[in-house]
Amino acid sequence: MTKAKFEIDNAAARALFLDRHALTNRSTQALTEADLYALIHKLGFVQLDSVNAVERAHHMILFSRGSGYRRELLHTLHHDHRSLFEHWTHDASLIPMEFYPHWHHRFAAAKARLKHPNWSSRIGDDPAKVISRVRAHIRKNGETLARAFEDKGGGGWWGWGPSKTALEHLWRTGELAIVRRDGFEKVYDLSTRVIPDDLREARPTRKKTIDWAARTALARLGFATHQELAAFFALISIAEAKAWAVAALKRGDIIEVMVTGEDGNAKAALALPDIEAELAAADTPHPELRFLSPFDPAIRDRKRTLRLFGFDYTIEIFVPEKKRKYGYYVLPIMEGDRFIGRADMKAHRGDDRLEVKGLWLEKGIKLDKARKQSLEAALAELGQFTGATRIDAGAPLRRAKA
């Protein structure tokens, strides 16, 4: 007889998922460098994004998990301590430095891809010459911004000039590293000057990286499909994650579970064998209200967010204004273990004002006195973090209460 799969009810699944994403409790104490590193290590990475409508994604993601977060700490970990490195997961991210060896496979894949004429031609008619010139410049001058080179536009990626495209080529293939960001501009240097030798020279096999990526992702998600494991770091393919799961199930390294969604339907997923202990140890989500970045890792997979929380969320930044349902920069509102609404916001830094352009509550959610006070407190806290001395939210709050 086939053994029945362990079942996880929706409330328990939410609690574990939010615990893994550091969203069950929120520290109000000032975070230390060690605290911040531990948080990023727990998450796996923190995504970088340049959009500054309210706050840049990396800062907002970390602030959502601790109001004592300070922006300069992230710079300290990345630039001063070299505890983090910047490269790609599903997007540009800051990643714990100890994970660096596994990115050699990404470097090799980028090197093979960039040899193709469709890619190399973006550097110009003589890509080898441009790359050699850029490499020589950095070897001689050290830390370099793209604007140190005079050739601009006229092709390349996103209108970049040949030298900027060559910089990206050398970074994507691991020859260069990003030392820090000035504003949001990348500062490049040779990897030999940035990455510790032991990590830079390590070469884990593909098999080891597949095992590491899948296990590390599963530990940070609590439960997942093989597709979700592959997507976590975007280091391995879906086929590789599936093959790993099949083998790991046979060995007993992982088990299959059934996870109940918000709609009551259950979906099969993978979990570590100690899942019952993990569920028991997960913190109960605190009922505090908080805003999340549109790029928060907890909502990155929209289908999973809908399945687990019943929250249908889409980033509308790239949607033409007239076709947007909500707004340009809409932040999900979380209360305990559920999403209760969303708010379109903009920080007007010229006049120190945080504007709530629109507020929409989920079906069945009422803006009673207690929730209104919690919302106003969360807005005041976010306003303080963004440097706003005034919160302009009166009209949306009145409409939401009506």
Predicted segments with their positions:
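Long, charged, low-complexity, helical-prone intrinsically disordered regions
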Residues: M1-A402
